[in-house]
Amino acid sequence: SVGFKAGVKDYKLTYYTPDYETKDTDILAAFRVTPQPGVPPEEAGAAVAAESSTGTWTTVWTDGLTSLDRYKGRCYHIEPVAGEENQFIAYVAYPLDLFEEGSVTNMFTSIVGNVFGFKALRALRLEDLRIPTAYTKTFQGPPHGIQVERDKLNKYGRPLLGCTIKPKLGLSAKNYGRAVYECLRGGLDFTKDDENVNSQPFMRWRDRFLFCAEALFKAQAETGEIKGHYLNATAGTCEEMMKRAMCARELGVPIVMHDYLTGGFTANTTLAHYCRDNGLLLHIHRAMHAVIDRQKNHGMHFRVLAKALRLSGGDHIHAGTVVGKLEGEREITLGFVDLLRDDYVEKDRSRGIYFTQDWVSLPGVIPVASGGIHVWHMPALTEIFGDDSVLQFGGGTLGHPWGNAPGAVANRVALEACVQARNEGRDLAREGNEIIREASKWSPELAAACEVWKE
């Protein structure tokens, strides 16, 4: 027969291939699929594979000019989700050639670009991605990574302490710098611009940069410790963002900050390259993540956004707090914390990790615990996150009845007490409150903080 068979086609004939052996170079994806009533799971899984790779809704003449077998995504396994009716995990393998090297932007446009609006699906969630080593090697990754950061800061054997300056909107640059100085002087390692502090009428970015730099050099001179303030370089255009980053470098500060989801992966990767070339650390905030990751059956899990950030580049990223949440969430959070920090992470479904991930020596990212935490949480945080983390107390520092500096002192004393207790072999989970109480006998600042935030 001449020509080809026209017409709308069944996806599963071409894109559902249960005998496919995945290649080491494939990008693997685990999707949680909720098909519309009457759509078989194989067809739904195949539709996802097709729509996110070579497929289109009908047979086209130009299909004859290419090798589908070489370029198509394949749904190679489907399993029902325990405890949910009509939900399936569809595993899809994508050939590496479908993706541009070193572009998180292109990876996401391909894998999650179009398929989420697909009619045959009621909902779709990307749960995990396996990034093959061949693709990982096309990315620079974090500007410096955990070890280099410790060496730059000369801080070892403990988590780092931070604080977001509040009220986040409305302070003048001079008063903002003053708040930064008080916190750093009191014993914090870092202070942070809030994610929505960019360059507003009440405080233009250059004024803030200047006063914050002054504050941190003064605190550095007085304490003999290296200090940092995350200067938020996020801006409306990439050019403006780079201008801010360059200004930070000229001031000689150690670290800048970026909102990677609202700023976009292209901007973030550009900034990460600049940071490595110019010796700046890069702190990443995840504003907008809940828009993408909060629904259990639709969107993308945060572990995917975290992996994407490690490829794109950042030295710190916000990762939730775990404290006071459900146990299950603790395991899941620790799963993606390991994916950020470790070089090799084994598949472990109980921790939400669908694929073994080998990062082939890509530098690690330090997770940042932030949001609603205070001194009584310190033992749990030290135990859960370990040394390679930043613990960020905004209200938990600035809410201290005696002011910012005593608030900073309280947090530092609590942290040092927890680290010492851990190193002496005490059980932080069981004796946490006792450890904090003992320490507060020697520190009136900590005692006052313990009073304000009673567990």
Curated annotation (Swiss-Prot):
One of its GO terms (biological process) is reductive pentose-phosphate cycle. GO terms for molecular function: magnesium ion binding; monooxygenase activity; ribulose-bisphosphate carboxylase activity. Its main location: plastid. Mg(2+) binds at K192, D194, E195. Its cofactor is Mg(2+). It is found in: Plastid, Chloroplast. The keyword Chloroplast applies. Substrate binds at N114, T164, K168, R286, H318, S370. Pfam families: RuBisCO_large (PF00016), RuBisCO_large_N (PF02788). InterPro entries: RuBisCO (IPR033966), RuBisCo_large_chain_AS (IPR020878), RuBisCO_lsu_C (IPR000685), RuBisCO_lsu_C_sf (IPR036376), RuBisCO_lsu_fd_N (IPR017443), RuBisCO_lsu_N_sf (IPR036422), RuBisCO_lsuI (IPR020888). The disulfide bond which can form in the large chain dimeric partners within the hexadecamer appears to be associated with oxidative stress and protein turnover. The modification N6,N6,N6-trimethyllysine is found at K5. The active site is at K166 (proton acceptor), H285 (proton acceptor). The modification N6-carboxylysine is found at K192. GO terms for cellular component: chloroplast. Its EC number is 4.1.1.39. It catalyses: 2 (2R)-3-phosphoglycerate + 2 H(+) = D-ribulose 1,5-bisphosphate + CO2 + H2O; D-ribulose 1,5-bisphosphate + O2 = 2-phosphoglycolate + (2R)-3-phosphoglycerate + 2 H(+). The basic functional RuBisCO is composed of a large chain homodimer in a 'head-to-tail' conformation. In form I RuBisCO this homodimer is arranged in a barrel-like tetramer with the small subunits forming a tetrameric 'cap' on each end of the 'barrel'. RuBisCO catalyzes two reactions: the carboxylation of D-ribulose 1,5-bisphosphate, the primary event in carbon dioxide fixation, as well as the oxidative fragmentation of the pentose substrate in the photorespiration process. Both reactions occur simultaneously and in competition at the same active site. Belongs to the RuBisCO large chain family. Type I subfamily. This is Ribulose bisphosphate carboxylase large chain. It comes from Vachellia farnesiana.
